[in-house]
């Protein structure tokens, strides 16, 4: 979730900002809402609501379950996130006897609060921001895939969004294509910041992955920095961007995939985790069926 999600010039955001508890509360609120990781949930109000993306895998920690059970209601971002909490059960064991005394499981009601996408911000358009037009003007490839997301911790094949393996697979797929027809991959990514150190670190990682392919490697472009909503929407709609691709192994929601989908362009993603709440499996390739059998039995 971006740290600049709440804008001071947005009247709706201003009302939210006004209601953020910044000091010690002098009286118990009727309703207390906390957006956090579950192990930090606190029972402060008369009725307490915890909002979390949860965790992007199939099991949650016992600290997360205990934190959720402190609250009166939990709201999560996807059915995938909810399933992880609901399906996780731990044995309660007596420290002295080592005998099971019960189960640790989710006891607080949990609901999915679908985030959706703001179609006043993300929509299909041909009116592109000058920054994006200028940035992509140097790209000569007529067909580009786009990836948007953080490049998280882990070696190739280990990071949660699987960015490194996506790059390697892209190289393997398009390494022998003629340069004039070569497909490109555009990475809009970062680690944790938009610093020069962050940019240089990612650049080095990309270079290490593509190095074995030499001059056979397809073109890979790297966008780094904080783009506005308008700039991101222009990036999604740019005519050189033909599809979005993600090898993600776990999403609490997968917001960029939904934002991109409003363009009507194809989205290639794993059939797993939070984004399948809004991305349905649908592969329709144009073509014609013909009988290609030889005049013999086989």
What are these model-derived regions, one by one?
Residues 2-86:
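Extended catalytic core of nucleotide-activated donor transferases of GT-like folds
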Residues 18-25, 89-109, 199-219:
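Short mixed-charge
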Residues 73-131:
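Donor nucleotide-sugar binding/catalytic pocket of nucleotide-sugar-dependent glycosyltransferases
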Residues 119-234:
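Conserved catalytic-core segment of nucleotide-activated headgroup transferases in glycan assembly
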Residues 234-252, 262-265:
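Acidic donor-binding loop of glycosyltransferase active sites
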Residues 254-257, 272:
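Short glycine/serine-rich donor-binding loops of glycosyltransferases
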Residues 266-269, 283-284:
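Short hydrophobic beta-strand element within catalytic cores of glycosyltransferases
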């Amino acid at each position: 979730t971006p740290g600049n999600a709440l804008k001071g010039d947005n009247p709706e955001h201003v009302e939210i900002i006004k209601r953020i508890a910044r000091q010690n509360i002098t009286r118990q609120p009727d309703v207390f809402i906390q957006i956090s990781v579950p192990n930090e949930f606190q029972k402060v109000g008369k009725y307490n609501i915890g909002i979390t993306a949860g965790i992007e895998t199939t099991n949650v920690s016992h600290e997360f379950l205990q934190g959720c059970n402190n609250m009166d209601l939990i709201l999560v971002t996807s059915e995938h996130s909810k399933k992880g909490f609901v399906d996780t059960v731990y044995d309660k064991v007596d420290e002295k006897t080592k005998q099971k005394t019960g189960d640790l499981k989710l006891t607080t009601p949990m609901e999915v609060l679908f985030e959706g996408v703001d179609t006043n911000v993300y929509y299909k358009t041909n009116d592109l921001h000058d920054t994006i037009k200028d940035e992509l003007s140097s790209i000569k490839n007529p067909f580009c895939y786009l990836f948007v997301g953080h490049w998280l911790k882990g070696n190739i094949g280990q990071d949660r969004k699987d960015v490194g393996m996506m790059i390697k697979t892209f190289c393997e797929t398009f390494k022998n294509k003629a340069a004039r027809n070569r497909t490109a991959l555009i990475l809009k990514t970062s680690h944790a910041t938009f610093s020069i150190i962050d940019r240089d670190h990612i650049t080095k990682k990309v270079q290490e992955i593509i190095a074995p392919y030499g001059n056979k490697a397809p073109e890979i472009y790297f966008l780094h920095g904080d783009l506005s909503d308008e700039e991101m929407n222009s990036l999604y709609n740019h005519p050189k961007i033909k599809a979005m691709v993600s090898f993600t192994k776990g999403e609490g929601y997968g917001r960029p995939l939904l934002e991109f989908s409003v363009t009507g362009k194809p989205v290639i993603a794993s059939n797993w985790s939070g984004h399948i709440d809004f991305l349905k499996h649908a592969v329709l390739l144009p073509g014609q069926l013909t009988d290609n059998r030889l005049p013999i039995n086989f």
